[in-house]
Amino acid sequence: MTTRIKEIFQTGQPDQSVTVQGWVRTKRELKEFTFLEVNDGSSLANLQVILEPTLPDYENVLKTISTGAAIAVSGNLVPSPGKGQNIELKAAEITLYGDCPPDYPLQKKRHSFEFLRTIAHLRARTNTLGAVMRVRNACATAIHSFFQEKGFIWVHTPIITANDCEGAGELFTVTSLDLKKPANFAEDFFGKRAYLTVSGQLQAEVMAMALSNVYTFGPTFRAENSNTSRHLAEFWMVEPEMAFCDLEGDQDLAEAFLKYIFKFVLENCPEDLQFFNERIDKTVLSTAENIVNSEFGRITYSEAIELLEKADRQFEFPVEWGVDLQSEHERYLAEELFKKPVIVTNYPKTIKAFYMRLDDNNKTVSAMDILAPKIGEIIGGSQREERLDVLIQRMQEQGMNPDDLWWYLDLRRYGSVPHAGFGLGFERLVQFMTGMTNIRDVIPFPRTPLSADF
């Protein structure tokens, strides 16, 4: 039976017989014996394996096993006299599954993230990307745990849709038509234009109107031709929707949600977060602890504008009531003024989506964004417009044809209730958690303009 390396470091005892399987990170030959550093992906730390000349076929083992090779090692655990770990494995038997030639790209040196993106099929074998994937896994586990503990139902919304939820028009078209001929979408597979989804929100609202509290967690797509460190064409979104909920309840849930995730990852990935704190961003741990222990600030958009207008600095983008907050404004509020996450609410209706509930002043909507230090907006949400006549008017104001979303309007015709929800970009969360500067390095296979090789 194979034992994972993480388990060995947690509960392994001297003289315990184990078998480990993994990949050789380094090989160091001395006169009397050889050291291998082996990693199986379960932990940041490698397990040191000692090969002695008494090992069967020792000379051949030394010739065939190199950095990158896949092996299985059986033997007994022994106390380690060296620094860095308390226990190591004295090999009694070793099996080579797959050798690795000298042109293996991942040798014992630090590689740039730019280079690693060109070998995305191998980069998870590095310390940094392996740690990213473990933190990503912990974040996903925490998300499901949070909502399941609160009685939410996970619903699966469609990947292919005829709707543009965000109204941005940056959509990937799905078609079975011959692209060499003029397109007549009435003859296409669905009889109309179809797209890859940009959000599961509208369909999640449908489910919330029957199941009360639901959430989605799946891939979304934007055909936005942005080559930046903040944009991906394919990314994952978490989108809860709650029936019988208003803007205040939406804020409360979002704050509790973020705190839960950060606390979970702090408890379950301490070595990985310590690695990021030492190698990537020296504020990773303090930022995570700040999220968990701080009561988030709460201000309206109008109050935010007043604070920004009083700021003793010149912003690249001028501030006035009615403009959307830019990243520099969001980070100033979170990093310098509040020094913790802050929730900004009640934005002008002209800069927000049609489905957000119109406030009584007819100027703002019941929207909310959570702004976090270092990254800016991390969650965006709102109370949804539950009044049929107001929703139709808002759609018309934005140049939409209400008939295109007849089924969405039906939710307001048949048993409408106040409801609210929010969206969290999963990769943005992982980027924030790890301190990684480029969002392409927190997803296994980034999809960006001119990049879909893997």
From Swiss-Prot:
Catalytic reaction(s) noted: tRNA(Asn) + L-asparagine + ATP = L-asparaginyl-tRNA(Asn) + AMP + diphosphate + H(+)
SUPFAM superfamilies per record: Class II aaRS and biotin synthetases, Nucleic acid-binding proteins
Subcellular localization: Cytoplasm
Single GO MF descriptor: nucleic acid binding
One example of a Gene Ontology biological process annotation: asparaginyl-tRNA aminoacylation
Main location: cytoplasm
Disulfide bonds listed in the record: none
Keywords (A to Z) from UniProt: Aminoacyl-tRNA synthetase, ATP-binding, Cytoplasm, Ligase, Nucleotide-binding, Protein biosynthesis
GO (cellular component) term, any one: cytoplasm
Secretion signal span: none
Record keyword ATP-binding present: yes
Gene3D superfamilies: Bira Bifunctional Protein, Domain 2, Nucleic acid-binding proteins
EC number(s) on file: 6.1.1.22
Superkingdom, taxonomy of origin: Bacteria
Keyword Metal-binding: no
PANTHER family associated with the record: ASPARAGINE--TRNA LIGASE, MITOCHONDRIAL-RELATED, ASPARTYL/LYSYL-TRNA SYNTHETASE
Family: Belongs to the class-II aminoacyl-tRNA synthetase family.
Subunit structure, as described in the record: Homodimer.
Name of this protein: Asparagine--tRNA ligase
Organism field: Microcystis aeruginosa (strain NIES-843 / IAM M-2473)
